[in-house]
Amino acid sequence: MEWVTFLSHHLDEVFNNRERAMDQREVSGESDTGVRVDMTALAAGLRSKVPGLPIAFEHGPDAEIAGRSVVETDAAHWHGGLRAHHIEGPLPELVAQLTGSTKVNYYADQVFLKEPGSQIRTPFHQDQPYFLVDGPVAVCWVPIDVVGLDNGPMGYVRGSHRWNKVFKPSDFVTDTGTFPEENGVEHGDLEQMPAISAAEHDLVYFEAEPGDVIVHHWATIHGAAGNVSTTATRRAASVRYAHGDSRYYQRTSSPEPFRFTTGLVSGDPLETSDRFPIVWPRDSGV
C-alpha cells in the first residue's frame, strides 16, 4: 500500500493545494501545465445558458449539485510526484504482464475528483480517438478511495474493444454529445457513439478500493456514474501506457487538451520525445 499512500498525497496536493504546488513547479523552471476543468461549474453555467440541455447528471437535468467534480488532464507533466508514481511505481510492470509486451511507454494521465453529491456522470466513450498513438494502449484506473455503487463507479461495456469501431470523441458534458469539429478537429468517418444501456449492452460496474487497479483496452467503451453519496468522495488517477510497437500518430479527432506539443511526426517512436519514456523494462535508461 506504499504506492497508494504516495498517490493519495499527491492527488490531494493537485486537487486542494494546486497553487502552492504550481509555485514550487515554477521555481524548478517547468513551463507546461495540465489542463484543469471544473465540470461542476461548467455544467452549472451551461444549464443556466441552455435550458433543457441534456447534461449528464445522475438524477436528471434538474439535479441539485452539492459537491465538486474536477478533472485535470496531463497533471503528471508538471507534477513530479505524480510522474514518479506513474513511471517508477508498479503500473508499468503490471501492463507488461497483462499485455505480454516487451516494451511499455508512459503516455499521459488524467486525475479525477468527484465529491459527495456532485452528480455529474462521465459519459460513455472510448479513449482511442483522443490519443496520439498508433498501436495499443492500456489504461490503468487507480482509485485512492473506496468506490461503491453510489459514489462514481466505473462502468464498462464488456467486449466492446473487439467491435473494431472507433467512435467520435465525447464532449463529456452530455450523454451523446461530441467535441465539435473546430480548431482542427476532424471526425472523418468516425461513427456516433450509440446510447449505452444495461438493457442493450453487457454493461458492468465495478466496486473498488485503494490498492485495486482496473485496466482496460483503449477501445473499450466505458464511463462512470455520478457521485450521489452524501458522505463519500471518489478520487482516482487514469494512467495510460502504450505498449508493443506503438508509435506517434497525429490523430485528427484528438481535441484540446489532448494534443500534446512534442515535435514528433506520425510514425516516430514514442520515446523520441521525453514526454513518452520507455518505462518497462526498467533497464531502458529511466
What does each of the following model-derived ranges do?
Residues 2-123, 130-131:
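Non-heme Fe(II)-dependent double-stranded beta-helix
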Residues 1-3, 111-114, 129, 147, ...:
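Short, solvent-exposed loop/turn segments at secondary-structure junctions
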Residues 132-149, 207-210, 215, 240-243:
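Short, conserved beta-strand element in jelly-roll/cupin
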Residues 20-21, 25, 45, 166-175, ...:
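Non-heme Fe(II)/2-oxoglutarate
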Residues 9, 78, 107-108, 136, ...:
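Residues that flank catalytic or metal-binding motifs in active/ligand-binding sites
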Residues 124-127, 141-142, 200-202, 221-224:
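Glycine-rich, charged/polar anion/phosphate-binding loops
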Residues 149-221:
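Double-stranded beta-helix
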Residues 101-104, 126-133, 142-153, 159-162, ...:
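Active-site region of the double-stranded beta-helix
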